[in-house]
Amino acid sequence: MSKSYTTQNELLLKNLLEFYDDDNKLQYMLRIINGESKISLRIVDWFSTNYAKKHFTVYNIEKNRDKNLFKVYVDYKLKLKAYSKKRFDPFCRWDRITIPYKDNTSIQTTIGQLNFFRWALENNVIKYIEDNY
């Protein structure tokens, strides 16, 4: 009897690649990482870890037609605790992976960076920063 086991990283990566299957999401992340956006990677990190804590940043987000109150710092800490720094980090630290991109190109990133930006995009953190920066 042979069983196929999948690691947590493989499961997370599969889920992340499905999320980033829409090129616009990956492009949005890359613009920030490559310095082509009005906000920088450091600003996104600083907002999530410092500003949101000090100013208790809260706003409404819509999920499944319901409006929910989103507490940026509280949710950030919950994700960090659930995933650990290796799997939830805005910077390209730890083990790098190569993922396919458009026009037969690829990009190097980490699972942690992809996961952090998924959180930031899904919960309108990036949009909030852009609107208020």
Language model: regions and residue ranges:
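Long, highly charged low-complexity segments enriched in Glu/Asp and Lys/Arg with interspersed Ser/Thr
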Residues: 122-133
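IQ-motif-like calmodulin-binding regions
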Residues: 88-89, 93-101, 105
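Alpha-helical bundle/repeat cores within regulatory domains of eukaryotic proteins
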Residues: 100-102, 111-113, 119
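Conserved aromatic-histidine-acidic binding/catalytic patches
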Residues: 76, 104-108, 117
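Long, compositionally biased non-globular segments that serve regulatory/targeting/scaffolding roles
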Residues: 1-88, 99, 111
